[in-house]
Design a protein with these regions (language model features):
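Hydrophobic small-molecule pocket/channel-lining residues, especially in calycin-type beta-barrels
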Residues: 2-6, 18-277
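Sec-dependent N-terminal signal peptides
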Residues: 7-15
């Protein structure tokens, strides 16, 4: 019995020592205070640092077609019209609030949007996974590191790189397209305003084959300290858009298909009990 007790005490001591070591390793005071609810500040379109998106001629034509489609009431290839996730970097630009949770190995960004989007930013020093070992996702795979820029022993900036992104995606609701080759790389610097700690910035630079050169954009959010409210929203509850073939249609309140633009051809309804209108 004494031997068993000794083993148990030793195991407990080891567990407590490990817990204490982890707690010591994660010194919360070293990290910026990014707790709370953050809400976007400014217009929904990207605030470009170095001018409009430098699209290649091919993808400028795609963008022009998206804009024309949206002018006529269509979705302009914006994925959220079809209940698909916004993906990176559009998910960092939406109107719904976000929350940042910092842990020693992972920083989570939780976004209170359709189907509750989230990001995992690994800060444990890992390498990139082989492309064959990782399925592309809309949020991509993000690796980051905390940086002490002013040398005061505290972290100021979270530097992030994101790869392995799934298509289709657009930069924002204006329909600026990404290349569909899955080779997009996104680099970010996330940091608090030095003068106002209730303001946070996300400097984003995108490397993409739809661009003639990297494109830098800046986003700003403010901490909601008064009465932060969170909601859960399921896309299927509010979705009024369906895609049949390559064409989108609205769903009316009584379940009928409606056109999304003038003179739109009706879909093939031979298998449905609905007449063409």
């Amino acid at each position: 019995m004494g031997y068993r007790s000794s083993i148990g005490v030793t195991a407990l001591a080891a567990a407590l020592a490990m817990t204490f070591a982890v707690a010591q390793a994660f010194d919360d005071a070293k990290y910026p205070d990014m707790k709370g609810q953050w809400n976007r500040v400014g217009p929904p379109n990207w605030q470009a640092v170095n001018g409009p998106a430098p699209l290649t001629p091919e993808y400028q034509a795609v963008y022009n077609a998206n804009r024309a489609d949206m002018t006529n009431g269509g979705p302009g290839d914006v994925p959220s019209w079809y209940c698909l996730p916004q993906g990176m970097p559009m998910m960092m630009n939406i109107y719904d609030p976000m929350e940042i949770v910092i842990t020693p190995d992972i920083t989570y960004i939780l976004i209170s949007h359709v189907n509750d989007s989230y990001r995992r930013i690994y800060t444990d020093g890992r390498d990139w996974p082989a492309e064959d070992d990782y399925e592309l996702t809309y949020a991509g795979y993000s690796i980051g590191k905390w940086v002490d820029e002013d040398g005061d022993g505290k972290y100021d900036v979270l530097e992030v790189e994101t790869r392995l992104l799934k298509s289709p995606r657009t930069y924002d609701a204006s329909g600026i397209p990404f290349h569909k080759d899955g080779k997009t790389v996104i680099k970010e610097r996330i940091y608090l305003d030095k003068a106002d700690k209730n303001v946070i910035y996300d400097d984003i630079t995108v490397f993409d084959n739809a661009l003639t050169k990297p494109w830098s954009i800046k986003k700003k959010a403010a901490r909601n300290a008064k009465r932060p409210l969170w909601r859960t929203e399921a896309c299927a509850e509010d979705n009024a858009m369906v895609k049949i073939g390559n064409d989108p249609y609205f769903l009316s309140a009584d379940g009928k298909l409606m056109p999304t633009r003038p003179n739109q051809e009706p879909p093939d309804l031979r298998y449905f009990n609905q007449s063409k209108k």
